[in-house]
């Protein structure tokens, strides 16, 4: 395990801290993971952990970002689904299921943590890019895309933090939400005429 010394490149020490923190946050959650526990797992003092990540929220955000980036790379390099926005959405949600506890805790902390807001902003932009492509493929051209996107975002956010068991393929949930949101947006538009 890289020690916090000048003989080990900073990037390796920082990566070791992040790997240890990610494992602890995943298994123990935010509340039960301390900076001291992360330092102990890596073999450095808590102050050394804080040198790389100034706050526990920064470390937590970096852990969530690492999970998202690894999932995104997997998705974008998978020839079977890369370029298919529907399949990419389903796969990202599938890969995030084991981390729902972390997502719940992140949502609780977001109001107080710029770092967490930034990470979730990136995740939401990625989801929205794919979601808009799915909507564009299925919705009439005059549907209120903003309303449809907002409804779908609420669903995706709920799925990321839900404690309910997922008992069917995620593609079914995506189809249901997109179809329902498009239907509601179309019906609202028709009522206003």
Residue ranges: model-predicted function:
Residues 12, 16, 20-58, 62:
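Helix-turn-helix
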Residues 95-121, 161-164:
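Amphipathic alpha-helical segments used for helix-helix packing
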Residues 156:
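Cytochrome P450 catalytic-core helices
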Residues 72, 95, 114-140, 146-150, ...:
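Amphipathic alpha-helical packing segments from all-alpha helical-bundle domains
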Residues 62, 73-98, 149:
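Hydrophobic alpha-helical connector segments
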Residues 65-71:
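Short, basic, alpha-helical segments at the C-terminal edge of helix-turn-helix-like DNA-binding modules
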Residues 1-12, 23, 189-193:
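N-terminal intrinsically disordered/low-complexity leader segments
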